[in-house]
């Protein structure tokens, strides 16, 4: 059996536990409903890599995507809901989350990509996009913005060192598209090939003076008193769910939570995110 730690109804498996399990695992059936025993272990709960062999033995909901305060709130409410299911969140970027959804390695993908991008990455599968929140994205800069960075054109200044996001993240997709629209070559941006795998690590790079500027969501800048934030655009966070799953137990509980006024109020107070469209569903 795969050893795990249970936090409410959230199932957390460390990468070390998963590796040990995969070394001795035999094949099974995805979605077979076989329960995983919850046992007490000495490992600290960690996000695990999403593995096919693990999914074959999973009985809960696999959510692919990067974490956020709003998602943590949602998962906490799923734990308390009478119809909620155990949730394992696998931390990955937008592209990989949707890739996992397409190949049935995940049940839900959290993504901030545009609707057209989502449709193209998950072709032939009817999806429901459940809107979570809208949030501001822009540049992390040193306090006082000494390099006077206000637009993507300013990234070409030879004195400016940029910390990029990894390919497949919504931030990278947006930035690359913007560079193409403005006719700006990435070769003119010092540090373009330097990649961070989260907004937190991007902001840390600027805070620690390893870069002059990075691109990420506004809320993360609040954790770094030595940083300022320059807004560039707004992004919408969606939960992409196969349409056939929405009315199933567990999934319907998730939709109910997101559409509740309590959830909208708590998200707004906790994060300042725009909840004007929270709970709305788009069929694609």
Regions of interest found by a model, annotated:
Residues 1-96, 102-106, 122-126, 152, ...:
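N-terminal hydrophobic or amphipathic helices and topogenic motifs
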Residues 56-67, 153-173:
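Short loop->beta-strand "edge-of-pocket" segments that line small-molecule binding or catalytic clefts
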Residues 73-83, 153, 165-194:
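Ligand-binding cleft/hinge of the Venus flytrap
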Residues 131-138, 224-256, 275-283:
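Periplasmic-binding protein-like
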Residues 132, 141-162:
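Flexible hinge/capping segments at coil-to-helix
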Residues 143-151, 184, 244-250:
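Short helix-loop capping/hinge motifs at secondary-structure junctions, enriched
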């Amino acid at each position: 059996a795969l050893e795990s730690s249970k936090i409410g109804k959230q199932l957390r498996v460390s990468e070390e536990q998963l590796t040990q399990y995969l070394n001795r695992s035999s094949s099974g059936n995805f979605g077979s409903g076989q329960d995983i025993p919850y046992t007490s272990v000495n490992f600290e709960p960690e996000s695990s890599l999403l593995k096919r062999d693990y999914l074959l033995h999973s009985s809960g909901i696999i959510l692919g995507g990067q974490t956020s305060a709003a998602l943590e709130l949602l998962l906490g409410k799923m734990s308390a809901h009478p119809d909620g299911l155990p949730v394992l969140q696998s931390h990955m970027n937008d592209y990989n989350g949707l890739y996992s959804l397409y190949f049935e390695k995940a049940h839900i993908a959290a993504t901030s990509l545009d609707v057209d991008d989502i449709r193209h990455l998950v072709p032939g599968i009817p999806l429901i996009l459940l809107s979570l929140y809208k949030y501001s994205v822009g540049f992390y800069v040193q306090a006082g913005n000494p390099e006077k960075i206000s637009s993507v054109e300013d990234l070409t200044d030879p004195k400016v060192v940029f910390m990029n996001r990894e390919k497949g993240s919504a931030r990278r997709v947006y930035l690359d598209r913007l560079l193409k629209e403005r006719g700006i070559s990435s070769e003119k941006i010092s540090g373009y090939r330097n990649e961070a795998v989260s907004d937190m690590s991007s902001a840390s790079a600027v805070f620690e003076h390893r870069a002059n500027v990075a691109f990420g969501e506004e809320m993360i800048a609040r954790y770094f008193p030595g940083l300022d934030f320059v807004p560039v655009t707004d992004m919408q966070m969606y939960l992409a769910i196969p349409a056939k799953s929405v009315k199933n137990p567990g999934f319907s509980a998730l939709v109910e939570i997101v559409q509740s006024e309590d959830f909208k109020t708590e998200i707004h107070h906790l994060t300042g995110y725009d909840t004007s469209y929270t709970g709305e569903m788009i069929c694609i």
